């Protein structure tokens, strides 16, 4: 099974502020949906709570250390390892956040789907340093800022060189 991380990063690898994404880019939301639809998504509890519901068209697995925590429409796992063990029959597992789960999953990741957002913003959660791990760019496309997207962004797919 491929382990893939998908994230949108502003300058300095910023991914969040106060458990929210500090931008709204419809182009990135469309990209996220296109990449993840039909694939299982693994997320931390706080990420799930910030989304507020299971993502439709995807198997949703939430990692929570609280054994009593549950939510309708999701599977709960006590760790990343346990979450991935639930998905052994899948071709690709998509790790969708948050920061702690990205940091834990990154050393095992085979692929990164990153949206680079051309914005200098303030926040408290960052994507871990990934450049030193050796990646090959597979694909890159650009979306300019427009009336619906406040910032230009690039969609980049990277594959781990092993």
From Swiss-Prot:
Its EC number is 1.5.1.3. GO terms for molecular function: dihydrofolate reductase activity; NADP binding. The keyword Heme does not apply. One of its GO terms (cellular component) is cytosol. Keywords: Antibiotic resistance, Methotrexate resistance, NADP, One-carbon metabolism, Oxidoreductase, Plasmid, Trimethoprim resistance. Belongs to the dihydrofolate reductase family. PANTHER family: DIHYDROFOLATE REDUCTASE. This is Dihydrofolate reductase type 3. It comes from Salmonella typhimurium.
């Amino acid at each position: 099974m491929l382990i893939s991380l998908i994230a949108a990063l502003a300058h300095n690898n910023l991914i969040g502020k106060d458990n929210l994404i500090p931008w709204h880019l419809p182009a990135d939301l469309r990209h996220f949906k296109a990449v993840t639809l039909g694939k299982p998504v693994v997320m931390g509890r706080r990420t799930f709570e910030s989304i507020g519901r299971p993502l439709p068209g995807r198997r949703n697995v939430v990692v929570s250390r609280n054994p009593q925590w549950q939510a309708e429409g999701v599977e709960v796992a006590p760790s990343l390892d346990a979450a991935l063990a639930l998905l052994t029959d899948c071709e690709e597992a998509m790790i969708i956040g948050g920061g702690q789960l990205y940091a834990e999953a990154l050393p095992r990741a085979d692929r990164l789907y990153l949206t680079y957002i051309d914005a200098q913003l303030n926040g408290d959660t960052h994507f871990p340093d990934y450049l030193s791990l050796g990646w090959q760019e597979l694909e890159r496309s650009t979306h300019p800022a427009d009336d619906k997207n406040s910032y230009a962004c690039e969609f980049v797919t990277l594959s781990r060189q092993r």
